[in-house]
Amino acid sequence: MDDVVIIGGGIIGAASAYFLSKEGRKVKVIERDPTYKTASFPLSLGGFRRQFFQKENILLGKFAREFIYQIPNLLKTEKNPNPTASMVTNGYLLMFGPEHADEQYKALENHKVCEAGTKNIKGSELSKVFPYINSEGIETATYTDNQSEGWIDPFMFHSALKSKAIELGAEFIKGEVKSISEIKAKTIISAAGCWTKDLLEDIPVVPQKHTVFRVKCPKYIKEMPLTGDLTTGVYWRPEGGEYLAGSPNSVFDATDLEPAWNDFEELVWPALAQRIPAFEELKLTGGWAGYYDCNKLDNNAVVGKHPKFDNVYMASGFTGRGLMQAPGIGRALTEIITTGSYQTIDISDFAVERVLGNNARPEPYVL
């Protein structure tokens, strides 16, 4: 019988394998597509942030930053003595309309308690800090300028985690698991992401397709933060002389990754041009679509022991946050598996019982 079997070798599976292997557990990771062609992490914008509503998400975001900064030391291997995730620390800027202002002020209290280091700015003052932004319709905004938020290369991060886990003794194999009952192990972790319901049908996690557009503009602002306009749901960041912009539209239970090209002219371009006048001259140069493993109950992760099994744990439903929360979730799963409780960040409120009992804890800061 195996010691630990992880179903899913994406970013959550790789992070869990790393932390468990560090503790001396014998880990086997089963991944059906080692190219990760349709996995969530390589098709994301690579963002990491601590600007959230729920305290657990804020703290997981803080740990992500700490971990990413230590990649050169933590994840170096004999084959790769200089691992990197190509971190860019331009920060995050989130903008809110009047309808979200009260909720945002409550969130700021959680930011203070968790020492998130975010700054609040009135909408009327926004253009003084970011002169290229039209602040019409913005009531308040939060941002960071202390190198605590930004983005990374998702594939490089995953590769570094996986390589280190393998050096520590983890085994990654190609295979497809169709039923939990197939696995004979002391501990089983479902990190199946969008396809969680194929294994645990009582968990409300489904694929949610999002489209990202690549655009070019004569005015390129390299130092622009990853910006989310929560009045429209559109978000964007600079990338290699161009910009990447995400559509607020999404498709639940999608079975393909064909980009929603019509969204660009109908939704994304108008929203971008209204917020940043220079974006009126945008030109679409490409795009792609990727999946969120969306928790339809409340957009929050589902993590912990499944009460219907003696030895099954799970981690999914990150709704676009899997990459940034992977280090904290991998560590948390290792803690609860090896000690029986969370030792660092208490994520007990993300428990499986929450979704089985339909007890929502909404996370409104979803991009």
Which residues fall in each region the model found?
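N-terminal Rossmann-like FAD-binding beta1-loop-alpha1 element of flavoenzymes
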Residues: 2-28
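Short hydrophobic core segments
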Residues: 5-7, 183-194, 330
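Glycine-rich FAD pyrophosphate-binding loop
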Residues: 22-41
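Central helical "cap/lid" subdomain
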Residues: 37, 186-225
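Dinucleotide-binding Rossmann-like beta1-alpha1 core, especially the glycine-rich loop
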Residues: 45-129, 233-234, 272-273
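Flavin (FAD/FMN) cofactor-binding and adjacent substrate-gating region
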Residues: 70, 95-168, 173-174, 295
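Active-site lid/adjacent beta-loop-alpha segment flanking the redox-cofactor pocket in flavoenzymes
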Residues: 217-311
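C-terminal catalytic lobe of FAD-dependent flavoproteins
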Residues: 276-367
